[in-house]
Amino acid sequence: MRGKKCWKRVTAVLMAFMMLVGLVMTNGITSEAYWYNSEGGRYPNVGYRTHVQSKGWERTLTLNGRTSGTVGAGKRLEAIQIIVEPGYGVGVEYRTHIQSKGWEKTWKKDGETSGTSGEAKRLEAIQIRLTGTNKNKYDIYYRVHAQTYGWLGWAKNGSIAGTSGLAKRLEAIQIVIIPKGEHAPNPLPAAPGTAAYVH
């Protein structure tokens, strides 16, 4: 009986992994993605990758607060894709403010591309929010590295991160999901109290 339960569990895990790989590949995000967080599955992993000036799309997903993009290289972000680990009843949607175009009229979701490629347009700001039946159980935090300003403060749950009206490019981004109401991510290296949005 015990062996049967163990086999069912292994089968369920394999099915979930296959669904994840299928979702990742369907949305154009590399299947080299892997999922891990140090909290033992208390909250969903978030993966993201950016399209960087003169480099194109990053080949693999960046996870859970790590930096996607470049710092100190003077390269603009041109587009982004974001995806949340399945199985938690949570999805993600996002939109960007694009050079000479302004805010996208529609929100992109679950691995879709927000921004442009091949047009040499910089991203200037971003909004990200959770969707799904369990969206109110978590907060999504994100911050950007902006031209001239460096790392800005953390934004969360659909608020704006970046700049507008200043012609400043986004250069890098960090995104993390945590249980609702827990403390915000460590503010370093941005100074405590640094605004998430400059305009």
Please give the residue ranges for each predicted region.
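Lectin-type carbohydrate-recognition ectodomains
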Residues: A33-H199
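Sec-dependent signal peptide cleavage junction
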Residues: V21-E39
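Bacterial N-terminal signal peptides that target proteins for export
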Residues: R2-L14
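Secretory targeting and sorting signals
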Residues: T11-M25
